[in-house]
Amino acid sequence: MTLNIGVIGTGAIGRDHIRRCSKVLQGSRIVAVNDINRDNAAKVVSDLKLDAKVYDNGHDLVKAADVQAVLVTSWGPSHEEFVLAAIAAGKPVFCEKPLAVTAQGCKNIVEAEAKHGKRLVQVGFMRPYDQGYRALKQVLTSGQIGEPLMLHCAHRNPTVGEAYTTDMAITDTLIHEIDVLRWLLDDDYVSVQVVFPRKSAKAFPHLKDPQIVLFETAKGTRIDVEIFVNCQYGYDIQCEVVGETGIAKLPEPSSVQMRSGAKLSTEILTDWKDRFIDAYDVELQGFINDVLAGKLTGPSAWDGYAAAVTADACVAAQLSGEIVPVTLPPRPAFYNK
């Protein structure tokens, strides 16, 4: 059985997902493509030698009879309207983050999906599909180290461009930890504080870097996340869980260990795409399999909404320097199915 997919947005991530679905994964076929720049969409179809129709309008693509599922990889502010259109059409939709650019936009999607009565939305949070995070989750679920008491995490990038701003440390960078740590702990955040250490001389004048984000969860677990986007040395993701009877740490990516010139060394990756490339494959294959099986199991619209509410609280904490509550309404029973 093959799933016919339409893709809205053929920028870098859209093009990569089209390549992935048409050349790497099993059970899918790209039958429709749309982009605000029609020539760009046509070029992707030509370059990848696809038998796919190029649509001038994303809404027409969603309504197309041969499109069974939709990937939304367009400009962030357009995500909400296309996800809502897919829900209205009763079609499963995979939406790259952000689900919407505001928490209210995410809530609109949650309400529309609940009204439809069936899960149709998966959000593009890929870290729960990473082999290392899955292994860490398995350790926590097994109870081998008891209940998690504290987490020490870091998200480090070698450099960022001059357009990167202080709030983007939350909305572009920390957003991944916001999602994956909720999933890892099966817990929600109740408060957040952001503190700023001594500023790195490598950061642009307008950017506060590094930052430390301090969370408390509903179960009382404390989390500290270091965000350092000008660390220079590489792309480095760390996560250490301190439990009642032991410590579990996210494994490092596989790398050859070298002994040479009186030094023992291993390589550190420099690009986030290399660090999580396999997770992207597993994530989209999971979406395809779930749609064909008739039940989505990946990150939900509720997860996207929770991430947006938490990110808003983090940005408020950046500005105030105070402990800011993270206020989520009760999760609808619809998402407990």
UniProtKB/Swiss-Prot annotation:
Its EC number is 1.1.1.18. Involved in the oxidation of myo-inositol (MI) to 2-keto-myo-inositol (2KMI or 2-inosose). This is Inositol 2-dehydrogenase. It comes from the Bacteria. InterPro entries: Gfo-Idh-MocA_inositol_DH, Gfo/Idh/MocA-like_OxRdtase_C, Gfo/Idh/MocA-like_OxRdtase_N, MI/DCI_dehydrogenase, NAD(P)-bd_dom_sf. It is an enzyme of class 1 (oxidoreductase). One of its GO terms (biological process) is inositol catabolic process. Keywords: NAD, Oxidoreductase. GO terms for molecular function: inositol 2-dehydrogenase (NAD+) activity; nucleotide binding.
